[in-house]
Amino acid sequence: MQNRPIIIGVTGGSGGGKTSVSRAILSHFPDEKISMIEHDSYYKDQSHLTFEERVKTNYDHPFAFDTDLMIEQIKELLAGRPVDIPTYDYTEHTRSSKTYRQEPQDVFIVEGILVLEDKRLRDLMDIKIFVDTDDDVRIIRRIKRDMEERGRSLDSVINQYLGVVKPMYHQFIESTKRYADIVIPEGVSNTVAIDLLTTKIAKILEEARNSK
């Protein structure tokens, strides 16, 4: 492993293709030590609230995340020490009792809707990416994901999108585009942007190895 891991931040609106872009980067480097860390894993524990109260949580607001813990754990990984990353139970709307062990890597992709919102987190990143996708495409993807993977009803997804997700995107997420080094329109389908990005990452890795 090289001396200092590369940190790549990937953000954009919910359903915008952040995870697909992150996975495209991962698949481009099968022989590298590279992992993805999701901001969603750091949703705050809500076990002290009733289920009805948890359901009303605004998950698209910065206060929903334990970003302090994420920053602390990324710093540990940068120092070459493993961490136990929390997991979130989307059916119970609270943090799970399970964690997973993340070992140090050469590259970490830090992915989530608000990973560029906190300056402390931005300052740890070597490359900052904003995936820019049309609102209509994002809501369709979100409906499909939340119904299939998170057990949500159509009405609940639509109501949450119109009441919380869309306004939070315009209030907190869209404005972080100005911090991005690279803006990728239409996400993973923009193969030119993905190729340019992976070429840049490969160059950074090569330079890091040559500087040893």
Curated annotation (Swiss-Prot):
<feature type="binding site">
    <location>
        <begin position="12"/>
        <end position="19"/>
    </location>
    <ligand>
        <name>ATP</name>
    </ligand>
</feature>
<dbReference type="InterPro" id="IPR027417">
    <property type="entry name" value="P-loop_NTPase"/>
</dbReference>
<dbReference type="GO" id="GO:0043771">
    <property type="term" value="F:cytidine kinase activity"/>
</dbReference>
<comment type="pathway">
    <text>Pyrimidine metabolism; CTP biosynthesis via salvage pathway; CTP from cytidine: step 1/3.</text>
</comment>
<protein>
    <recommendedName>
        <fullName>Uridine kinase</fullName>
        <ecNumber>2.7.1.48</ecNumber>
    </recommendedName>
</protein>
<keyword id="KW-0547">Nucleotide-binding</keyword>
<keyword id="KW-0963">Cytoplasm</keyword>
<dbReference type="InterPro" id="IPR000764">
    <property type="entry name" value="Uridine_kinase-like"/>
</dbReference>
<dbReference type="GO" id="GO:0044206">
    <property type="term" value="P:UMP salvage"/>
</dbReference>
<dbReference type="Pfam" id="PF00485">
    <property type="entry name" value="PRK"/>
</dbReference>
<dbReference type="GO" id="GO:0004849">
    <property type="term" value="F:uridine kinase activity"/>
</dbReference>
<keyword id="KW-0418">Kinase</keyword>
<keyword id="KW-0808">Transferase</keyword>
<keyword id="KW-0067">ATP-binding</keyword>
<dbReference type="GO" id="GO:0005737">
    <property type="term" value="C:cytoplasm"/>
</dbReference>
<comment type="similarity">
    <text>Belongs to the uridine kinase family.</text>
</comment>
<dbReference type="InterPro" id="IPR026008">
    <property type="entry name" value="Uridine_kinase"/>
</dbReference>
<dbReference type="InterPro" id="IPR006083">
    <property type="entry name" value="PRK/URK"/>
</dbReference>
<comment type="pathway">
    <text>Pyrimidine metabolism; UMP biosynthesis via salvage pathway; UMP from uridine: step 1/1.</text>
</comment>
<dbReference type="GO" id="GO:0044211">
    <property type="term" value="P:CTP salvage"/>
</dbReference>
<dbReference type="GO" id="GO:0005524">
    <property type="term" value="F:ATP binding"/>
</dbReference>
